Each structure stands twice: as structure tokens, then as C-alpha cells.
Amino acid sequence: VHWTAEEKQLITGLWGKVNVAECGAEALARLLIVYPWTQRFFASFGNLSSATAITGNPMVRAHGKKVLTSFGEAVKNLDNIKATFAQLSELHCDKLHVDPENFRLLGDILIIVLAAHFAKDFTPECQAAWQKLVGAVAHALARKYH
């Protein structure tokens, strides 16, 4: 993926404002609520029976933070996203058997969360840069499937 200086600035500038624990928890909770079939990968998380149960679930919150912390590695390694996610791709493909489409869905959810939290800063140019990033991350995570 080729990044312009402006795209890198838009991504890193917004990322510096992100509360990883809060936005990560919200993104994963939204994924599980909006796309309930994704819950099957989180059976060990206990009660996921309602939106309230999901948003209040400490395991969802913790894993959401973990997911977004990992996403931060992409922000730090924009020029080497494939290598950054090689091990996670292997884990999600070989061991967890996650449908790679779910990576795209989570990326789209993250865009919504960022837009909701940073409406003023989340300009169309910023969104375009972030869409490119979540697409690159989803592709890198799905790489082991190809």
C-alpha cells in the first residue's frame, strides 16, 4: 500500500486522540450487536444475549482494547502492514477459523466509531485515509487464507 504524506498525517493525527480502551470496546461490542453471527467466535465470553449484556461484558471490553491496540501497530507500521499482521493472520485462519469477511466488517465498524467520536476531525479526506487503512489491515489479516 502506498501512503501519501497527507494520508499518513490524517491517520496518525487522529490516532493520537483515540482512547484505545473506549473505542476498542465500542467497536467490538458494535460488531457483536450489529452482526450477531460473529458472536460464535466469542462463546467463552459468557453473556452476549443482548446489547446491554454485550456492552457491559468485561471480556468484550478487554478484547476490544486488545484488538484496537493491535490495530495501533498498523498505524505505527503503515509501510509494512502485511508483516505486522502475519502472525495474527495465521492465528485467525488456522486456529480460530474466522471468516475473513469479518475483518472487513470490523473495519467498517471502526470507521463508524471514529466518526462518532471525532465528528469534527473526521473529514471526508480523513475518512478516505482511514478506509484505506482498515482495508489494508483486513487484507493483511485475510492473507493467510489466500
UniProtKB/Swiss-Prot annotation:
Domain of life: Eukaryota
GO terms for cellular component: blood microparticle; haptoglobin-hemoglobin complex; hemoglobin complex
Globin domain sequence ranges: 2-146
GO molecular function terms listed in the Swiss-Prot or TrEMBL record: haptoglobin binding; heme binding; metal ion binding; organic acid binding; oxygen binding; oxygen carrier activity; peroxidase activity
PROSITE patterns for this protein: GLOBIN
Pfam families on file: Globin
Further comment found in the protein's record: In pos. 135 of beta chain, other birds usually have Arg (the positively charged AA contributes to the formation of the phosphate-binding site). Here the non-polar Gly reduced phosphate interactions, and oxygen affinity increased.
Protein name: Hemoglobin subunit beta
Lineage per the UniProt record: Eukaryota, Metazoa, Chordata, Craniata, Vertebrata
Gene designation per UniProt: HBB
